C-alpha cells in the first residue's frame, strides 16, 4: 500500500479525498461570490501580511478497517489553514542536521488529524494502529517559478498555482489548548441552561467531569535545510513569513490584548485556504530518492518525480474577504463558546467542551478548509483564530476564538468564562503556548 504514494494517480487525488472541517457544519458549500479567490494581495494591503504568514495544512491518512478477519484500507484527508507563530533557529552545535524548526498555529480540530507515532507525549498515545498519517503537505498559492522553471513543466513563465510541498518528516504536536483553565462542568447536567452556568473551579482532577478546551493548537515542523525540498519551503514560504511577523511587531507586540468592548471599533481581515469546487492549477513539490531515516522523526515516503503539475477539479484555493477598499469585515457580536457553540470532543478518555470568548465577523465566513486562519485587526494585530462560519438566508458571519482578552473590573464579564491568555498566560490560565516555547 505504501507504493501507492509514488503513483501520479495518488498525488493528483490527495486534494480530492474526503475533506473534513468543522467550518462545513455552518457553511453552505462553495459559496464564494463575496470573496477574492486566488488573488494575491498587494504589498500595501493589510492582507499581504496575512498572506505571507498563512499556509495550507494537509494531513493525508491511511485508514484500515477490520471486520470479521477482513481488512479494508481507505485514504482520507483533513485540510486546514495555519500561520507562523514562532520558530527556532538552526542549532550551531549541530550543523550536520542543519534543522530549522517552524511552529504553526491552527485549530485544535485541524491538528487532531495528525497521527504520528513519533509525536511528543502524550499526543503519540492515541490508538493509531489503524489510522496513521502517511503524507503531510504545507501549501500556498504562489508563483511556480519560485520552485521550478515553468518551462520544464510546459507552463508559461508567469504561471501561478497552488503549491503543495512535502517536507522531509511529519510534523509533531507542540501545543493544544486542553484544560487551559482550572474549571470543569458537572457530568450529570440535565439541560442546556445548567450546562451554560455550572463551570466551577476544579478542586481535584476528575476525568468524569466535562473539561474545557479552546479551538487552538500549534504544530511543530522541522525543516532540514540540507534537503532541497525543505530548503525551498524555508526560502519561499517561511522566510517571507518571518519577515512579515517581525514587521508586525514581533511576539511582544503582534498579539492584541483587548477588552471585550474594544472589538466593535475595529475591522477584521481573514485569509485562508477554503476548499472550493473550482478548477485549481496545482504543483506538487515532492521528496525523492531513497526513503530516509531520521532519528526521533517519521520520515515521509519519497516520490518518483520532484515536481508534478496538474489541474484539479476542486481543492484549497486562496480566499479572502472581498470588501470595499479591502477594508475587511466588521464586528458583529461577542459570543461565549459555552453558550453559543457548545462543541464537544473526546481526548484520552476525557470529555471536553469548547470554552472561552469569541467574535462574529460580518462577511467573514470562508468555506471548509479555512479553519485555523488568523484574524488580523486594522492595527495589524492578531486578535483571534477562525474556527467556523454561520449562515442564515440573509447574512453570513465568520466565527473566531479569542486568543487572549482582559476583563473590565467594574463589569461582570467573567460570569460565563474567565479571562484567559493562550499566548503568554495570566492568573487564570494554567496552560498556554509560551510554556512550551520556553522549554
Curated annotation (Swiss-Prot):
Gene Ontology cellular component terms for the protein in this record: plasma membrane
Family: Belongs to the MG067/MG068/MG395 family.
Membrane topology term: Lipid-anchor
Pfam families: Mycop_pep_DUF31 (PF01732)
Span of the signal peptide: 1-22
The name this protein goes by in its record: Uncharacterized lipoprotein MPN_582
Lipidation (N-palmitoyl cysteine): 23
Species this protein is from: Mycoplasma pneumoniae (strain ATCC 29342 / M129 / Subtype 1) (Mycoplasmoides pneumoniae)
Subcellular locations according to the entry: Cell membrane
Keywords in alphabetical order: Cell membrane, Lipoprotein, Membrane, Palmitate, Signal
Location (main, coarse): membrane
Lipidation (S-diacylglycerol cysteine): 23
Stored InterPro entries: Mycoplasma_peptidase_DUF31, Peptidase_S1_PA, Uncharacterised_MG067
